């Protein structure tokens, strides 16, 4: 199992089990601008878990412990279907591209301000490069990008980021997206190699939400 960078800062007996929650240790909802809440708001952006690692995770298991009455859905986008749907001339452009993924970049672009990473954290989680298009064991292909994707290798930074934004807009169109409305006790498992996901915004300062997460280590990217 993977241990999230944020989990390393929490004194828990089982660090591989990570609570994504707006409820503090004292049982009260944390303030909107507190680090715990700011971190959660970062998950409102499309992303795939741990793509900032040299070997990203395989899948994520998310269990709903407590959910708000309205909002707080998780949206999933099918990156295989999105890639399959793009024109052949666009496939020729993107097939050979490599993307630099960076934990420092995604933290810096969080909707709220997170504390700066220490030198030890920067050394532990350096930028890493992955193919923009992943090829799976069955031969299918999918986009691999999201919130940790900083820029495209060998391309001017702004130009690469514009292309990534365009591809993200294409691949998260309604026809590629499933919205899961949570009920307490739900367990959803997804393949991070071929999906993006994000939290649908909700009243994070007014309603409790406790989600328990486990992330499974992956294998080298092809």
Q: Residue locations for each model-derived region?
A:
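Fe(II)/2-oxoglutarate oxygenase catalytic core
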Residues: 1-189, 193-222
């Amino acid at each position: 199992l993977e241990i999230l960078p944020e989990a390393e800062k929490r004194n828990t007996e089982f660090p591989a089990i990570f609570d994504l929650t707006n409820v503090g240790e004292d049982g009260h909802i944390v303030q909107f601008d507190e680090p715990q809440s700011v971190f959660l708001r970062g998950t409102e952006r499309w992303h795939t878990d741990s793509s900032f690692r040299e070997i990203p995770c395989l899948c994520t298991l998310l269990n709903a412990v407590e959910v708000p009455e309205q909002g707080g859905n998780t949206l999933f986008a099918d990156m295989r279907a999105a890639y399959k749907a793009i024109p052949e001339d666009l496939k020729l452009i993107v097939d050979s591209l490599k993307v630099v993924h960076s934990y420092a970049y995604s933290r810096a672009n969080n909707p709220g301000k997170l504390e700066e990473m220490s030198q030890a954290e920067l050394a532990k989680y350096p930028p890493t490069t992955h193919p923009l298009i992943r090829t799976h064991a069955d031969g299918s292909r999918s986009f691999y990008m999201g919130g940790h994707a900083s820029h495209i290798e060998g391309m001017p930074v702004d130009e690469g980021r514009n292309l990534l934004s365009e591809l993200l807009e294409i691949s998260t169109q309604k026809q590629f997206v499933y919205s899961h409305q949570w009920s307490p006790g739900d367990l959803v498992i997804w393949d991070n190699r071929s999906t993006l996901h994000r939290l649908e915004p909700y009243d994070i300062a007014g309603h409790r939400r406790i989600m328990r997460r486990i992330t499974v280590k992956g294998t080298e990217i092809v």
